[in-house]
Each structure stands twice: as structure tokens, then as C-alpha cells.
UniProtKB/Swiss-Prot annotation:
It comes from the Bacteria. This is Ribosomal RNA small subunit methyltransferase J. Its main location: cytoplasm. It comes from Laribacter hongkongensis (strain HLHK9). Its EC number is 2.1.1.242. It catalyses: guanosine(1516) in 16S rRNA + S-adenosyl-L-methionine = N(2)-methylguanosine(1516) in 16S rRNA + S-adenosyl-L-homocysteine + H(+). The keyword Disulfide bond does not apply.
Length: 281
């Protein structure tokens, strides 16, 4: 096992078989990183090398690629607008300023009370929205993401957040780890983290309202978390206080096991699982 530390707090940790595909497979045609005037050669090379991505000179006619526009990295396609991770403006800013503080459901779910600020591992980081909320409430959050596309978007978003006066202290509490979360958690000592947070993506059943085209594209490229049951088991063996699983309000349980408790909101539900003894050697 080896670990490489990149700028912006990125910790890249992979098994010795670094060239092996990750369990979360990209299910759409993703081409790589597009060189644009908005990115320096050094930054392009760092992202390409850090995430195993090819560099492109021209945009493809079809499929998906990553590109910087006006200093922001986005997932692009001919068929929709860019998908970006952003912790500075837009929805992140609104939620930071008006999201309800410690009274919002995700805060209650992770056990935020009074001065208690649990250490959290967001093991399915995605675009980092919930992780940023937890960090904005004072928690130290490790974002673990195995998709090279999602991890690259997060890396870029964290870099921008660290440069903005309104968010740099929040972003300083966030560390990005590019790894398979189940493998990474299995290497951590039992009880070394207070809370493990899971928000796995699953195939669209057609029963929920249609997501925006951009988010549909993100899920198509990143892929579904079909091994989330294994991740839950490992998470319960590592968490010192609880594991939180975010689900649609009426969604099925992640596994057949009933949670120890639940926090139910208007559209989402947080299933709370107690820690388990670590697996025997």
C-alpha cells in the first residue's frame, strides 16, 4: 500500500494494483480531461496523473469528458450543461446561510448536539453536498470517493473553496481520499472515526421524480453503488458511534437488517446503525 499527497488536501490511496479497475464502474463512454485555455498544463497533468485520466486536445462528438471553464471543472457532454461540484455559491451558499444549522435532519442524524462535533467519514462522497454541510457545522469530514470523475470534481471544488474567504475555514475541515471506501475503511482501526455516513446511488427505478439531466448524466458516468451492503458492514466495524445511511423517505432498507433508529424528513430518511465488533483476523 502506498499513499501520495497532492495539493488541496487530496490523499490518494489505492491498493498495490493501482491499474486495476475500481468496483464502481463507469457505465457510459467517458473520454478524459479536455485541455482548455482555462487550465494550466501543470494542473492538467496533476489531475490526469492523480486520477488516471487521459488528456484530450479537442472535445469528442459524443460521450462525456471533464473540462475547465472560467476556472471551474465540470463534467460535459453535447446533450446537457456541465455538472460541477461547488461549495462557494449557488445551493451551497444558500444552505450554508439558511439551512437550519444544528436542527437540520442530517445534523441530528450524525449526532450533533451542543458542543459535540463528531468526526465523520463520508464514504460515498459524490459531489460532497452533505459533507460540506457537516463541515460547515464544525465537523471534520473525510470524503472518500472511488470514482475518478467525482473525485476530480471534488478536488477542484475544494481548491476553490479554500481560496474563498467565506468558505476557507470550512474547506480546511474537509479531506478528500481517492479510494474504494470499503477497502479504505477496512484498514482503519476500530472506533477511529465517530460516524460513517453513506448515501449510495442506485439504479433509477422510475418511481421517483425525474432528476435533472445533469444529475442523470453524473450517475450514468459515475455508476451505481451495487456493493453498498458490503460497505455498510465494514462501516459498522469501524465506526465508534454510529453509521448513518441516507435513503429516500419511502425507500427500502439498504440491507435486510432493521436499523437501530431513524430520522425521517419530508423527502429523505436517515437509517441509524449501531457499531459492530471488528471482524476477526
Amino acid at each position: 500500500m502506498h499513499e501520495m499527497i497532492f495539493p488541496c488536501g487530496l490523499s490518494h490511496q489505492r491498493s498495490s494494483a493501482d491499474n486495476a479497475p475500481l468496483p464502481r464502474l463507469m457505465v457510459a463512454m467517458f473520454h478524459g480531461l479536455l485541455a482548455t485555455p482555462d487550465v494550466s498544463p501543470a494542473t492538467l497533468e496533476r489531475f490526469a496523473a492523480g486520477y488516471g485520466l487521459s488528456c484530450l486536445a479537442t472535445p469528442p462528438d459524443e460521450g462525456y469528458w471533464l473540462a475547465w471553464r472560467a476556472g471551474v471543472l465540470g463534467l460535459e457532454s453535447p446533450h446537457h450543461g456541465a455538472v460541477t461540484a461547488d461549495f462557494v455559491g449557488g445551493a451551497a451558499r444558500h444552505r450554508r446561510e439558511f439551512g437550519g444549522g444544528a436542527g437540520q435532519p442530517v445534523a441530528r442524524a450524525i449526532g450533533l448536539k451542543g458542543s459535540q462535533r463528531p468526526q465523520v467519514v463520508d464514504a460515498t462522497a459524490g459531489l460532497g453536498r452533505d459533507a460540506f454541510v457537516m463541515a460547515s457545522l464544525g465537523c471534520r469530514v473525510t470524503l472518500v470517493e472511488r470514482s475518478p470523475v467525482a473525485a476530480a470534481l471534488l478536488d477542484d471544488a475544494l481548491a476553490r473553496a479554500r481560496l474563498d474567504p467565506a468558505t476557507h475555514e470550512i474547506a480546511a475541515r474537509m479531506q478528500l481520499v481517492f479510494a474504494d471506501a470499503a477497502d479504505w475503511l477496512a484498514q482503519q482501526p476500530a472506533g477511529s472515526v465517530d460516524v460513517v455516513y453513506l448515501d449510495p446511488m442506485f439504479p433509477d427505478t422510475g418511481k421517483s421524480a425525474a432528476a435533472k439531466k445533469e444529475m442523470q448524466a453524473f450517475q450514468v458516468v459515475v455508476g451505481d453503488d451495487l456493493d453498498a451492503g458490503r460497505l455498510l458492514l465494514v462501516a459498522r466495524q469501524v465506526a465508534g458511534k454510529r453509521v448513518v445511511v441516507k435513503r429516500p423517505r419511502l425507500g427500502a432498507l439498504l440491507t435486510g437488517e432493521k436499523p437501530a433508529g431513524q430520522q425521517v424528513g419530508k423527502s429523505t430518511r436517515f437509517d441509524l446503525y449501531a457499531p459492530l465488533p471488528p471482524a476477526s483476523a
